[in-house]
Amino acid sequence: MSKTVLVFASQSENSAELENKYGKYCVTKSLNLDGVCVEGIYSNRQSLSKVYNTFIKDENSITVFIHDDAYIRDPDWTEKLKTALDKYDVVGLAGGSEAKINAPCLWHIMCPPHTHRGCVSHVNDDRKGTFVTNFGKQGRVLMLDGLFLAFNTKKLFDSGVKFDESCPAGYHFYDIDFSLTCNSKKLKLGTTYIDVVHNSHGLRKFTDEWQSGQAWFMQKVTDGKYNI
C-alpha cells in the first residue's frame, strides 16, 4: 500500500507557534494522521511552487498539498482520497468546471456559479464554531482551489507537470496555473467530499504582489501556454 504524504508550508517557526496562531483549526491538529508522513516546512520564505516541486518525485505515494491553516476534520479522509484518486488524477475540495479567463483572476469568479463544485467549511468570524460553504455537487473540474491538492506522486511525476516557479506572487495563482497545466497534459481534475475546515475566508485585498501575479497569469493565457 502506498504511503500518504501531507505537505504544508508555514511562515510560523514551529508547530507550537502555528497552533498558537490558529488554535485547533490548523493542519497539525488534523484527524487520523497516524501512518501519514507529515512534511511541515516551517519559517518558509519560498514560493509555494518552489516548495511543492520538491515533493513531486518518482515514488509510489499519494501526496497532498494543504494550507497550514486548514484542519482535516474527517477521520476517513485517507480512504476517501484513495477512492477519489481512482477516478481523478488530481483531487481537490473545490473548483469550477468551466472558466472565462478575465480579471479578477479568481477561480470562483472566472467560473460561473453553475459550474462550481465541492464544499469547504470555514471558521465563524467570532471563532466559535464553523459553517459550510457549499459550492455545488462533486465532479470533474477545470480549476481547483489550492487549499487542498492531492495526486498520485509517480503519475504526476511521469506527466512532467510541475508548478511554475516563475510566478512573482508566491502564494497566489500557483493553483489555477497548475490546474490548467494539468488539463493541457490531459490529466483529469475533480473534487471529492472530505470535511476540511479553512481558517481563512479567502483573499481580502488585491495587493501589489497579487496584481503582479495576475499580470503574469494573464500573459501566459495570451501566449497560449494552456491550450485553452
Task: List the predicted regions and their residue ranges.
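N-proximal low-complexity "stem/linker" segments adjacent to membrane-targeting elements
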Residues: 1-28, 35
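A short beta-strand-loop structural module common to alpha/beta enzyme folds
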Residues: 33-47
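Conserved catalytic core of nucleotide-sugar-dependent glycosyltransferases
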Residues: 80-162
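Glycine-rich, basic loop-to-helix element that forms the pyrophosphate-binding segment
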Residues: 43-59
